[in-house]
């Protein structure tokens, strides 16, 4: 496929936080002919911003293309594993591994676990941008009836925070308000969800969560 792309994977993603989402130009290929396996690869060469429909050269910074490949294998309905890699030309290499596992406990009750890990390596340290980073998160959710109770932990390591431009990071504490991705940052989440189908109102749901963080390298982010 060649043309406009709205990529949605752990290493290439678009942002729809505004009325006009950003998009990319490039080419890609996907395949799901093997039962349980989805694979994809692509190269993004141009991008638009959310406040401008015109396109600029380069998927990230000027003249920097982004090449990615990876996929997800579902062993069964309860267990899947994802592996992805990406190269931002003359900028960074990034690798991702993720796993999602649901353990049925009883009728209507299950325990869901999600693990995500990113490793980003600087490809050209001469430009002054530090991007070396390892980011990991673990979330556990108890689903019982129409209720869900979850906790999550996320941690950053390396010489910098997690570098991102647009869209969602596939980490538990990356939310619309903040990604909690500063250098050395550790963050903790508590979450509750309710499905109002339990009150006879299907399609209506409620979610609340609290996230706090610590250990940020304030010298790196420029905070006194």
Where are these regions (language model features)?
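Repeated loop/turn-to-beta-strand initiation elements of outer-membrane beta-barrel proteins
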Residues: 1, 36-40, 48, 77-82, ...
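Transmembrane beta-strand segments that form the barrel wall of outer-membrane beta-barrel proteins
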Residues: 2-14, 39-45, 69, 77-89, ...
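Gram-negative outer-membrane beta-barrel proteins
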Residues: 8-14, 47-51, 77, 89-93, ...
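Outer-membrane beta-barrel domain signature
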Residues: 13-18, 52-62, 70, 84-89, ...
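Residues that define the transmembrane beta-barrel architecture of outer-membrane proteins
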Residues: 21-25, 63-67, 91-95, 132-136, ...
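Residues on the lipid-exposed face of transmembrane beta-strands in outer-membrane beta-barrel proteins
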Residues: 27-31, 69-73, 97-101, 138-144, ...
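Outer-membrane beta-barrel strand-turn architecture
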Residues: 31-35, 73-77, 87, 103-107, ...
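Extracellular/periplasmic loop regions
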Residues: 55-56, 112-202, 217
């Amino acid at each position: 496929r060649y043309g406009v792309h709205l990529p949605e994977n752990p290493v290439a993603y678009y942002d729809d936080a505004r009325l006009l989402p950003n998009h990319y130009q490039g080419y890609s290929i996907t395949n799901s002919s093997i039962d349980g396996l989805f694979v994809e690869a692509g190269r993004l060469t141009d991008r638009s911003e959310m406040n401008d429909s015109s396109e600029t050269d380069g998927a990230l910074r000027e003249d920097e293309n982004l090449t990615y490949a990876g996929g997800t294998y579902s062993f069964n309905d309860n267990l899947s594993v994802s592996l992805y890699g990406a190269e931002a030309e003359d900028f960074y290499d990034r690798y991702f591994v993720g796993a999602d596992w649901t353990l049925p406990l009883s009728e209507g009750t299950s325990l869901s676990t999600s693990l995500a890990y990113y490793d980003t390596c600087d490809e050209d340290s001469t430009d002054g941008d530090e991007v070396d980073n390892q980011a990991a998160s673990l979330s556990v959710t108890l689903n019982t009836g129409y209720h869900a109770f979850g906790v999550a932990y996320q941690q950053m390591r390396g010489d910098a925070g997690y570098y991102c431009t647009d869209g969602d990071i596939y980490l538990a504490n990356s939310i619309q308000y903040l990604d909690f991705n500063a250098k050395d940052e550790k963050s903790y989440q508590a979450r509750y969800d309710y499905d109002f189908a339990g009150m006879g109102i299907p399609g209506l749901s409620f979610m609340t969560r609290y996230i706090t963080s610590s250990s940020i390298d304030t010298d790196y982010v420029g905070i006194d």
